[in-house]
Amino acid sequence: YSRSNSAESNILTEKYIKKIAGFFIKKNMKIKLFINTIGFLHDDKHLPEKKFQDINFEYMKKSFEINTIPTALMIKYFSPLMAKDEKSIFATISAKVGSISDNFLGGWYSYRASKAALNQIIKTASIEQKRINNKLIIVSVHPGTVSSKLSKPFIGKKEVQTPEESAKKIIIL
């Protein structure tokens, strides 16, 4: 399909993810590029935890409900719709802090854990999908530090890129 299409959905429910996939099925569309940009780090009530005692059940649950579970469901419903006769890509935005081996600072328990779980889902799904559609690449991408509402409270003096700059770098991959 040569033109981009967007469909609004409530990303937190399986019902709506399935409904959006149904939109593509009805149009008999095969997807060549799927980019999932869903992400959550903080809200008005909670900032990332600095120590273990700061862990809050609702905040941690929300982190997984937004950062992890919808992507698993998107893979479930959209991977069968990905093109099989040519290379297709299912990419999801993740975060370097989701790397277990790259954790040198600690803290941010809910965000780190939800992104680590996301990365594991991506890795496991990519292995499974190779057996089903060897033209499909399932990958997670760290976009770098991007100037956004998500990162604004934590940027400090770090080098920051605009969303457009980050998107250009991701597309090059």
What residue ranges belong to the model's regions?
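Conserved Rossmann-fold SDR core element
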Residues: 129-146
